[in-house]
């Protein structure tokens, strides 16, 4: 609204008036048509009417209104009277100075500040009133015993009632106390929410740290494999200097739809026919225990010439992939393999093979045993401790063969030159290269390739690697960074010919350090994965037990894979773009089979990002022939002998705690007496070891944080990024593909009505996650306590299985295993629930079985990892742990209700139910839960993909005609939009109905009708039922005779006949 006209001193220009309120404009806004109005007038009009108030144009929105600053400044310079002119203020000020004057105007209204007065006065008279005239001003304190302040009015009246004054004072204090309690509750709620958010952030950070550790362990395994393969070839001279090439013919057979190797190379395009020999198809990676890794199979660096008679020597990468996809078994592959030339030498004498030292293989088990020893004078270890991943080699080479050409080539570095041609269709295509240059050495002015975009032209070509040095670009020798940028950013060139150089043995500097650093890295990985492995092993054992009960006790991979009625395409995933939310059923089933065949590997995939499992982070683009069906444990980063190694570690630790710490490796050591005489030394060493592990964990966290900061710096470094010239800094992140974790599915159940209490299906976000009672610190102590029963019992006690966990609280007599022949007739999930209910019948007492309590149930106060998903730092918050305990209680109650309902429906569930499948989901805080989802969703996704493929070549008219006749399939996003529109329409419909009811009520209230009494309402009810049943069980004959023949308007109502028989 505008300013009143009579407040201004003098006449006001009519152009400064608002056309709506006819007052002086206040914060003027203009419409696109040129009209000016007050902001308080035009905004409600536009929101309600949607047009200009002058009715000069069509639709108008509030975003189209603009401020008129010159007009506003002109209005602010007008003279205006004070708003308190009616109270006596005669000041006339500028409009822009009016707010400042109102703050200190003496004629502004103000209230007395004494409690109990509240008289409205002028601001200039408040002080005098409070000092002289106010009856509520204090004049002293009561001397009659209450001690409360005495006002002037009470003193003039002759005193006050102390009891009434004390009651009033007490009430005021109670009101203040209540207000403080409310404020305290609000602050507590706010602090609780803050605490939960911080705990969630800490959990997410811990999960990200674990995933980063797993990713680096995966890279470590891959680099170790590369180093092994290069070390085997280090004795052989390079090609053309002592090597010969021979042709081999191999026969391959697919194993579960996979060939088990990766390829790189190929010509960049079909039109380029003059390719060099370096553009062939080469084997870049071979999966262990795969079809290609068998004896007489492929080897790394083999060049593929033919596949089933089809020449691939000059084929492109895509043609080679298609040839392997369409090849029929048996697949006959012709390859070229480099072999060292045979050298004629005389056998060395026997004295040359004699080693004067003693080979001692010190592995990780020895180190863990030595850390448990007591402190007094332990034996001095060899400073070069080799990790288990790199055991000492016992092979002996001939000195003449091994040292043949080393000395003469010691002072010069062998470089491998290669010319790479890149072609782009238009100037918008990106080459995908990120270049950098050295700044620490003045002599080295070369340009190096730091990163390659996986989806770029260079990555698809596959010949350029990270770390290559660019020598020439299009025949021009590159001297500095500016020349390289100018040549690569030229929009006129579509063909780029790059001459690159790389060492023949390209080794990373990070893996050339001494063995002590390698051992420390392995110790970091073991420490970070210790808690993660235990949680994953328990979940995997639960899933494995359920699969075991379904299949009748068999865990054969072939049996599980035969349950899937799907066919493999013959080649595994060859395009990373297929990893999206709407993945095909074929790929999901492949991952299901892997998770069921190897539960530990399946659970490991839950926490690994895509770049740890795929091949996207290799320095060259490759296509994978590795199907998800045959992926083994080694390929997922877990060695095959890891479980056996872990079991041996447990036995070793048990022996260390139960026997002498030096009796394992030094049976006759004189330090045995010292270890036995000091029983507290073991605990001290354990504490020292735990402190050391915590310090290493903090160091690892700092390394990860520094790595992230370095990545951020690299992203904003202008010298390394050339966005508009075809370069791009590609960063592989953990969170980029985190949504893939929610797409991992388990094998579908045949019929499962309710979720079992052994699984937490988590149908909503409020469900309780899986709760594990596993203590990494106390696990060894529990095993050591039962070590008198044998090492085998200790190992089996450490492995938590569903049977053991369900029988924790049973009596020894009830928990005796027995075979139930009728269990096969029941549904697997029902049988599992019945078994769990048997275990829960004996769990009403607070104490557990003494035999099983020590082995499985550690105390809450002694176990820092009672819940697998609760980090150690989160257990210091009492409110958070209290919340977890409440969730556990709710979960137990829900499981009991689920068991009761399942037992009731065992005999009545004969109807055909929809097929369901298990899905492993992940929450925002990092916890996982298992849920059931109908197979119908997956079928709908496949149907959507099929319809999309069928309609890809249709025109608009054909598509419209098909929608009218055949109906249309709505995608997921469109269905969400439909739900939102339906909710909006329902809300509008309810609003209209409510408005109509309110209107009717107002009309009824406007009429001068008298209010109906109970008798009239009873007559109205009887009129509705006069042609129906006369009376019911709650109506007496007297009521019918009294009310049945009357109506509110006085007319007679003819009811049905009523016969009364008096007995």
Swiss-Prot record:
Coiled-coil ranges per UniProt: 680-705
Post-translational modification: Auto-ubiquitinated.
Tree of life domain: Eukaryota
Enzyme class: transferase
Positions of region (Disordered): 545-602, 746-798, 834-853
Cellular location(s): Synapse; Cytoplasm
UniProt keyword annotation of Zinc present: yes
PDZ domain segment(s): 249-339, 419-503
InterPro entries in the cross-refs: E3_ubiquitin-PDZ_ligase, PDZ, PDZ_sf, Znf_RING, Znf_RING/FYVE/PHD, Znf_RING_CS, Znf_TRAF
BP-aspect Gene Ontology terms: neuromuscular junction development; protein ubiquitination
Annotated effect of mutating residue 18 to A: Loss of E3 ligase activity
Tissue: Highly expressed in skeletal and cardiac muscle and at lower levels in spinal cord and brain (at protein level). Also expressed in kidney and lung. In muscles, concentrated at the neuromuscular junction (NMJ).
Pathway note: Protein modification; protein ubiquitination
Gene Ontology cellular component terms for the protein in this record: cytoplasm; neuromuscular junction
Biased composition (Basic and acidic residues): 564-582, 746-755
GO MF assignments: ubiquitin protein ligase activity; ubiquitin-protein transferase activity; zinc ion binding
TM annotation in the entry: none
Pfam family, one: zf-C3HC4_2
Domain remark text: The RING-type zinc finger domain is required for E3 ligase activity.
Protein name: E3 ubiquitin-protein ligase PDZRN3
Organism of origin: Mus musculus (Mouse)
UniProt gene name: Pdzrn3
């Amino acid at each position: 609204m505008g300013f009143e006209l009579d407040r201004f001193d003098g006449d006001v220009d009519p152009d400064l008036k608002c056309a709506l309120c006819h007052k002086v404009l206040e914060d003027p806004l203009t419409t696109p048509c040129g009209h000016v109005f007050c902001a308080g007038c035009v905004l409600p009009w536009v929101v309600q009417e949607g047009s200009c108030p002058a009715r000069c144009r069509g639709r108008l929105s509030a975003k189209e209104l603009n401020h008129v600053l010159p007009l506003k400044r002109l209005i602010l310079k007008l003279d205006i009277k004070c708003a308190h002119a009616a109270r006596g203020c005669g000041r006339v000020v500028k409009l822009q100075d009016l707010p400042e004057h109102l703050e200190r105007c003496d004629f502004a209204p103000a209230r007395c500040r004494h409690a109990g007065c509240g008289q409205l006065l002028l601001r200039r008279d408040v002080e005098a009133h409070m000092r002289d005239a106010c009856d509520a001003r204090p004049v002293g304190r009561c001397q009659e015993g209450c001690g409360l302040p005495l006002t002037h009015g009470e003193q003039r009246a002759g005193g006050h009632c102390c009891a009434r004054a004390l009651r009033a004072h007490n009430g005021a204090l109670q009101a203040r106390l209540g207000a403080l309690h409310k404020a305290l509750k609000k602050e507590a709620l706010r602090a609780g929410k803050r605490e939960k958010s911080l705990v969630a952030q800490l959990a997410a950070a811990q999960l990200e740290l674990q995933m980063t550790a797993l990713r680096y362990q995966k890279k470590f395994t891959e680099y170790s494999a590369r180093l092994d393969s290069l070390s085997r070839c280090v004795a052989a001279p390079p090609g053309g200097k002592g090597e010969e090439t021979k042709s081999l013919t191999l026969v391959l057979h697919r194993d579960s739809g996979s060939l088990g190797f990766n390829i790189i190379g190929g010509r960049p395009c079909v039109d380029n026919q003059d390719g060099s020999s370096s553009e062939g198809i080469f084997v870049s990676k071979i999966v262990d225990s795969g079809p290609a890794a068998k004896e007489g199979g492929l080897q790394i660096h083999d060049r593929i010439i033919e596949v089933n008679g089809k020449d691939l020597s000059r084929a492109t990468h895509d043609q080679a992939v298609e040839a392997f996809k369409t090849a029929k078994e048996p697949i006959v592959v012709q390859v070229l393999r480099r072999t060292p030339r045979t050298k004629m030498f005389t056998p060395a004498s026997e004295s040359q093979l004699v080693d004067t030292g003693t080979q001692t293989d010190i592995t990780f088990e020895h180190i863990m045993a030595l850390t448990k020893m007591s402190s007094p004078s332990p034996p001095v270890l060899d400073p070069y401790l080799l990790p288990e991943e790199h055991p000492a080699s016992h092979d002996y080479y001939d000195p003449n063969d091994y040292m043949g050409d080393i000395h003469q080539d010691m002072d010069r570095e062998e470089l491998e030159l290669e010319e790479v041609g890149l072609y782009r269709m238009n100037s918008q295509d990106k080459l995908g290269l990120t270049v950098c240059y050295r700044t620490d050495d003045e002599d080295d002015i070369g340009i190096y390739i730091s990163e390659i975009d996986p989806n770029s032209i260079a990555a698809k070509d596959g010949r350029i690697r990270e770390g290559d040095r660019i020598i020439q670009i299009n025949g021009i020798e590159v001297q500095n960074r500016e020349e390289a940028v100018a040549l690569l950013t030229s929009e006129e060139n579509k063909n780029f010919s790059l001459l690159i150089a790389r060492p023949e043995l390209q080794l990373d500097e990070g893996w050339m350090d001494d063995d002590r650093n390698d051992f420390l890295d392995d110790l970091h990985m073991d420490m970070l994965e210790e808690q993660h492995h235990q949680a994953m092993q328990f979940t995997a054992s639960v899933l494995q037990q359920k699969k075991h009960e379904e299949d009748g006790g068999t865990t054969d991979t072939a049996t599980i894979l035969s349950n899937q009625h799907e066919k493999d395409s013959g080649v595994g995933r060859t395009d990373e773009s297929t990893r999206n939310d709407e993945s095909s059923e074929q790929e999901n089933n492949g991952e299901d089979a892997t998770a069921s065949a190897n539960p530990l590997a399946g659970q490991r995939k839950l926490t690994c990002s895509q770049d740890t499992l795929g091949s996207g982070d290799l320095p060259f683009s490759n296509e994978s022939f590795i199907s998800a069906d045959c992926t083994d444990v080694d390929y997922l980063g877990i060695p095959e002998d890891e479980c056996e190694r872990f079991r041996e570690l447990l036995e070793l630790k048990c022996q260390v705690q139960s026997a002498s710490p030096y009796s394992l490796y030094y049976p006759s050591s004189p330090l045995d007496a010292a270890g036995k005489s000091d029983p507290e030394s073991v605990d001290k060493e354990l504490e020292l070891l735990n402190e050391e592990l915590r310090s290493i964990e903090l160091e690892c966290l700092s390394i990860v944080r520094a790595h992230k900061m370095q990545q951020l710096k690299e992203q904003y470094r202008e010298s390394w990024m050339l966005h508009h010239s075809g370069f791009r800094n590609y960063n592989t992140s953990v969170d980029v593909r985190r949504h893939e974790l929610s797409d991992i599915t388990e094998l579908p159940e045949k019929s499962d009505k309710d979720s079992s209490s052994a699984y937490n299906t988590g149908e909503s976000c409020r469900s309780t996650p899986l709760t594990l009672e596993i203590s990494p610190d106390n696990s060894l102590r529990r095993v050591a306590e039962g070590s008198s029963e044998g090492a085998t019992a200790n190992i089996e006690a450490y492995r938590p299985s569903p049977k053991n966990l369900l029988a924790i609280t049973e009596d020894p007599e009830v928990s005796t295993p027995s075979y139930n022949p009728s269990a096969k007739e029941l549904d697997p999930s029902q049988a599992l629930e019945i078994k769990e209910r048997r275990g829960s019948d004996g769990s009403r007492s607070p104490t557990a079985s003494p035999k099983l309590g020590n082995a499985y149930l550690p105390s809450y106060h002694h176990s820092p990892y009672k819940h697998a998903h609760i980090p150690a730092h989160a257990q210091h918050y009492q409110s958070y742990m209290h919340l977890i305990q409440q969730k556990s209680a709710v979960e137990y109650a829900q499981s009991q209700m689920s068991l009761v309902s399942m037992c009731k429906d065992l005999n009545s569930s004969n109807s055909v139910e929809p097929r369901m499948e298990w899905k492993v989901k992940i929450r925002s805080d990092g916890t996982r839960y298992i849920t059931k989802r109908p197979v119908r969703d997956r079928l709908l996704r496949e149907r959507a993909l099929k319809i999309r493929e069928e309609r890809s070549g249709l025109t608009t008219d054909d598509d419209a005609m098909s929608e009218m006749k055949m109906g249309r399939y709505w995608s997921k996003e469109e269905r969400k939009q439909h739900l939102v529109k339906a909710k909006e329409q329902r809300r509008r419909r309810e609003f209209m109905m409510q408005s109509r009811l309110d209107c009717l009520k107002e009309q009824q209230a406007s009429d001068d009708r008298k209010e109906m009494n109970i008798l009239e309402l009873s007559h109205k009810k009887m009129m509705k039922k006069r042609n129906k049943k006369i009376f019911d069980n709650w109506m007496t004959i007297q009521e019918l005779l009294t009310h049945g023949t009357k109506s509110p308007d006085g007319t007679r109502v003819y009811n049905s006949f009523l016969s009364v028989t008096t007995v």
